[in-house]
Amino acid sequence: MIRTGRRLCLLGDANSVHLRRWAQQMIDRDWSVSVVTARPQAIDGVEQRVLEPVRRSADWLWRVGAARRHVASLAPDIVHAHYVSSYGYLAARCDRRPCVMTAWGSDLLVTPRQSRAMHWLTGWTLRRADLITGDSSELVELASAYAPSVPARLVHWGADTDRFAPTPWRDKPGFQIASLRSWEPNYHIDTLLEAFAQLPCSRLAPPATLHLLGGGAGEVALRRQAQALGIADRVCFHGRLDDAGMIRVLASCKVAVSVPASDATSVALLESMACGLAVVASALPANRAWLGEDPALMPSPGDAAALARALRRLCDDDALAQRLGAENRARVLRDGRRATQMDAMAALYEELLEKAGPRR
């Protein structure tokens, strides 16, 4: 049964493209959406309640009172927190049910390992959810280990396969590579630069080009590294781009690179696959789930030599790169369409409401 006038309150960073897309997808499915956030940015059609800024992890402890007041005032039918160790904690303290929590990756893969206290707090938080979602099997399994009695489901962020679509291979000039990942240590952009510098560009016409999207705090150091490696004229530092900008860059590229040390299913990965690019990705469980088990195209994080070999293989075998790109597009159409994933999430919301019954 589809209800009308349903109210969804998202707790998360309103300046995150992922949360913004989630909000829009649920508006498109006739939900009234509000956001409680410590990092505001206007979202069309969404009422927003802003918390005091958070500058260190301990600050989340002091945002509980305001979060409770905002959630109580908004009176949502469902509370959905994005990122367990921050907004998930706030949602757990708000005690508004049904409560959904979505793990983003590091909140389960990294943060709980930092201390016994964070390990305990992660479990305490997750056990107060009515449903947990994650975008990789690894995250779902971890969530179930922390909170065995709480249902955990695999829901991907998904890619907009109508907008992120292939361009004809023959229209891609030379050998161009894209990275959509942030310029932060986890994503090893420095390793990518080192590997790119090893490509035999003297025999390539036009020379290979590396496009770096995503932006981040590492820009100055990365620009210096590119200069020191002698590749600054072949590396384009685009920074953060909107969807149209990303699509424009990806249209000229044959290969995408995503080599983080830690990650769940990356939206950047899915969008690159949707555009029909061959992908070189670090040997992580979430990446293997989407790309298979070819070790030659799945270097260990931080291994510049292995990454260079993978790029050289695709550079030398254009037919292989084209075939892998086509296979990637087909895989995302089958399992990674955003609309399909958000339909599944909306159905999970409905199940929670039916189980909860009328709110008194």
Where does each model-flagged region fall?
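Short acidic/histidine- and often glycine-rich active-site loop of Leloir-type glycosyltransferases
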Residues: M101, L284-M298
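Conserved acidic donor-binding segment of nucleotide-sugar-dependent glycosyltransferases
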Residues: E293-A305, R313-D318
